[in-house]
Amino acid sequence: RMLAKHELSRLPGLPPLTSSPCLYEECLMQQPRLLVESGQPGLLVEVSSGDFKRLLSKATAGSFAVPLSSIRPNLDRPDDDRAEISQAVQSFTARRIQKRLEETIEIPPLPHTAQKIIKLRVNPDATVDDITGVVETDPALAAQVISWAASPYYAAPGRIRSVEDAIVRVLGFDLVINLALGLALGKTISLPNDKPQDATPYWQQAIYTAAVIEGLTRAIPREQRPEPGLSYLAGLLHNFGYLVLAHVFPPHFSLICRHLEANPHLSHSHVEQHLLGITREQIGAWLMRLWGMPEELAAALRFQNDPGYDGEDAAYPNLVCLAVRMLRNRGIGSGPDAEVPQQLFDRLGITREKANDAIAKVLAAEAALRALAMQFNSPH
């Protein structure tokens, strides 16, 4: 209500505007000039520390800030992930560490439908009838695949009456097998009730990212193009570690949400590393490997925040990195705007112009994609 009254979208760093209690970091007063949140995205107010001090007459000083240089998310040491996840579980949950990390965390088993789909993915002789049969054994999943194909985003002529219709007439075998796998996995862990204020809803972020990746993949030269369906799946599941963090560390997840709200200029990796000692990318990739998912998918989740990654299966994390950053720079997603370096386009063999075209097509169909996401976005 307070933000609406002043027509603001964020809490401004100007205490007199609100009657709320104010706590400020005392080291700020050692700086000659300050940049404080204005209440509008991308707009800061520059003020001298002396003038700002006069606004703090009813505020309380404290010493609680941490220099970013002391927080170092593990971007490039995947071999340390298991030990770091174990340490976080031991430190921040009441769970007693067992010999196997997966027993300690109590991760749900891979759904039966997903197990069948994984077997089909690696079967070169799999047919449309095979995937239709598997999807239709899970009525909720079948309904989701049909509604996906019926979305105005795909503009299919006539009604989509069955899973077979969705495959043959609209989506194709490769996309459906990966879409079905993504939806099946997405249901294994519930959406958390808590989330950072103003965060893009989980499935909206997932669907937009997958749609952008679909367009980017088509723009990559055929000889270096990664598997389109697997790229799409990487987009759908890129933020799966967010669900895992909420499942494994429930009380601390709320703390992460509040820290993200208080630090909109920071990536989630810094906040999670500071509070837990691990990031959603680490635990998401670990779970993909535990479930026996394709290594390309684990790499996509693990290295998606590193625009310079050029290791094994680099195209998949590079595509996620590019899609997420381009969406974020257009106001979709959470965290600060991030530069998209030219080397990222060069490594994928795609021009900046073609990437912009791909994202423009997705944003032109934003209403259709948002309607699709609405079916998934309530906690379940």
Outline where the language-model segments fall:
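Conserved alpha-helical "signature site"
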Residues: 72-340, 379
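Terminal helices and disordered tails flanking the catalytic cores of nucleotide-processing hydrolases
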Residues: 94, 325, 338, 342-380
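A short, terminal or domain-edge coil/loop segment
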Residues: 51-71, 213, 278-286, 349-362
